[in-house]
């Protein structure tokens, strides 16, 4: 028997789990716009208060994937997404976006899934636009971009149209809900490998196990202990790694890879233009913290993509991609390729 929204709400009030099939049903009601805004708001708030379980998040992500406009990629070897939940409040430049160019230059295929900044001063969509990339592509055009350049950017509103049915509720609530952690779990290109940054240490173990349930191959979920949703230079980074169906949790430190631990304060930006300047500086091989943190994150992504056998090997490949100018050339390549689809 299917659960009613009222029964689901009662379940959250009693701090009891909503089971997989029930969560599928409720999420489909929300995504179709068949649940009232009042009930939708109550349920997603109730879930947040009781703390969402791995099963509930996995079921919600399954439905969000169902409703997405998919990008069909022919060859998914060495295929990776580099994404963060955002919401870490660090206001740094777009490290994962910069890492995309380096990772692609070193031989991986990257399907980056992102949006405009909400909590940040500059989301991935904002900085890509500032670089001259056309972010408004159809799914088949994104697939062509991945095949041709090794990179594709999926602008979230183009791929998750059903999210409009919950957008007003989320905006008015103004608090984090399950939807804040679903984005990184719902890559429309179905990248089997992922480097995912999260905004809270508890999410490391949760999100990696959700990805395990969703059938992912090689995933590293990371949380910098200075609060960053990236691999950090300013502190140790918690890692949850899914590989060969098994989950391992551990800590890594910049010194493990011959990098100096330095504060991330110098990475803060006020807007997309400042982020663009810092991103290009890193890709132009200008010495400094920006280049080092991009190298560290791209190296980790190359390990996730199975291009490198370890993070250390990935960092070496990332260094070479930047020093050779290949990473910087990838920016111009993506701009040129996407501009042909300008409407």
Curated annotation (Swiss-Prot):
EC class: transferase
Catalytic activity of the protein: N-(5-phospho-beta-D-ribosyl)anthranilate + diphosphate = 5-phospho-alpha-D-ribose 1-diphosphate + anthranilate
One GO MF term: anthranilate phosphoribosyltransferase activity
Entry coiled-coil feature ranges: none
Pathway membership, UniProt: Amino-acid biosynthesis; L-tryptophan biosynthesis; L-tryptophan from chorismate: step 2/5
Annotated positions binding 5-phospho-alpha-D-ribose 1-diphosphate: 84, 87-88, 92, 94-97, 112-120, 124
A GO CC term attached to the entry: cytosol
Keyword hit for Glycosyltransferase: yes
Assigned EC number: 2.4.2.18
Residues spanning the signal sequence: none
Residues noted as binding Mg(2+) 2 in the record, renumbered to the chain: 229-230
An annotated GO BP: L-tryptophan biosynthetic process
Keyword Zinc part of the UniProt annotation: no
Residues at which anthranilate 2 binds: 170
UniProt family annotation: Belongs to the anthranilate phosphoribosyltransferase family.
Protein name: Anthranilate phosphoribosyltransferase
